[in-house]
Amino acid sequence: MLKPKDLCPRAGTRTFLEAMQAGKVHLARFVLDALDRSIIDCRAEQGRTPLMVAVGLPDPALRARFVRLLLEQGAAVNLRDERGRTALSLACERGHLDAVQLLVQFSGDPEAADSAGNSPVMWAAACGHGAVLEFLVRSFRRLGLRLDRTNRAGLTALQLAAARGHGTCVQALTGPWGRAAAAAAARGSNSDSPPGRPAPAASPEHRRPSPRRLPRPLLARFARAAGGHGGEAGSAGKNSGRHRAQGSERPELGRSMSLALGAVTEEEAARLRAGALMALPNSPQSSGTGRWRSQEVLEGAPPTLAQAPIGLSPHPEGGPGSGRLGLRRRSTAPDIPSLVGEAPGPESGPELEANALSVSVPGPNPWQAGTEAVVLRAQR
């Protein structure tokens, strides 16, 4: 039975940790509320916070619930223990992908080195957790990830993975996502700290996301746009020359948030591949502004068109019945294509040309002969 003395600040931390390890979510939440969240970043053994303990829980369901509870209640995501390790570092060592995804969503730093110079990326590579490593390099492929950084022993993440024979980790680091992350870091855009120096620990009073990390409001903005709610991101898309197809079947907020972080499941990918969203020229769905949507599937269309969401935008040189089909990836969802028609302008460029596959779609009506379709090949 819980006694009043168990709710004093010092004993409250112990009570909360015991409730968490016993899987008592309601009791843990009660202790947090009773102490006005004053223990949320208190230290336990080895200087670890409740968040660091939560990422190590063996049960996946309880682990996800407690990690989300602590993060939503304001736990500092980048605090360090006595060995300089963060919650993300501990989660990467154990290969707990669900915890890693939540920590990155709340601005966890994948380059925060511990006292031995090992970053979370290095821990994932050394322990052979290929799925965790692939998620990290995909999520930070545009923001940059210093994959060439060495620990105190002079080893990089790639060398750690290769020395232990972790082929999936080597592939993740040397594949297209790893190369993109390393190239973005090499450009030196918005560098957090000088090379070789560990990132400073975040204090509870000053928890601003790093400039290179995706802040939560920005992720929410992407999620609203992906959820078909329009809003600020939707209006920005109109002005940039890219036309986004509407639809109530776009992912809801929570699922879109995970997609924006690169957390793409096989089930999610299969659901989007299953339905072909085709746009009919001169159909009731067309509004004249490049925003069309229908469930029709073009007879005789190539398999790439029949298995992927398709957007339509007016072709610059075509007649009223011609158009340009485009399947373009959102920069924040690497495996999920966006319903975006590719129009000429600043958005076209080397990336489009390098990944585009032009297909000529002949009649019958309502499609005119010579309608041009451009489908981006999946990056492997």
UniProtKB/Swiss-Prot annotation:
Pfam families, A to Z: Ank_2
Gene3D superfamilies: Ankyrin repeat-containing domain
Superkingdom, taxonomy of origin: Eukaryota
Record-annotated disulphide pairs: none
Residues in ANK repeats: 11-40, 46-79, 83-112, 116-145, 153-182
Keyword Phosphoprotein: yes
Biased composition, class Low complexity, residue ranges: 181-203, 216-226
Residue segments, region Disordered: 181-256, 309-368
Sequence positions bearing Phosphoserine: 193, 294
UniProt entry keywords in alphabetical sequence: ANK repeat, Phosphoprotein, Repeat
PANTHER family: ANKYRIN REPEAT DOMAIN-CONTAINING PROTEIN 63, ROLLING PEBBLES, ISOFORM B
Official protein name in the record: Ankyrin repeat domain-containing protein 63
Gene name of the record: ANKRD63
